Amino acid sequence: MKKAICGFIYYKLLGWKTKVSVPDYDKYIICAAPHTTNWDLFIGKLFMGAIGRETGFMMKKDWFFWPLGPIFRWMGGIPVDRSRKTSLVDQMIKIAKSSQKFHLAITPEGTRKANPNWKKGFYYIAQGAGLPIILVAI
């Protein structure tokens, strides 16, 4: 049902087209760029829903306030606190290794502005957990 609803919205209402398919691996990192608008999240979630996949995503912790916080968590959101010194990369590697399925989308710019200096966390998570990286352009 969710796949049909997401597909209807993504393909019919919004008129998006897909030029490639996402491999059906049990675990992977999606590196999505460029990230230029907050709508990227919703377009990406609709696309993944339309092809029948669940994908988590990382987002600045400032967005996880009431009432959006519970909604973003329900959608698969992982709050990122950039001021903490603990390694989110190590936590994600541990979760990926211990999970049967692990699909995580990351925007490497770390912001919605053009940034040629990508953050490398997506790469370190993939390397540490032995995951393939799927590059996606929006």
Where are these regions (language model features)?
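Soluble catalytic domains of membrane acyltransferases
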Residues: 3, 7, 11-138
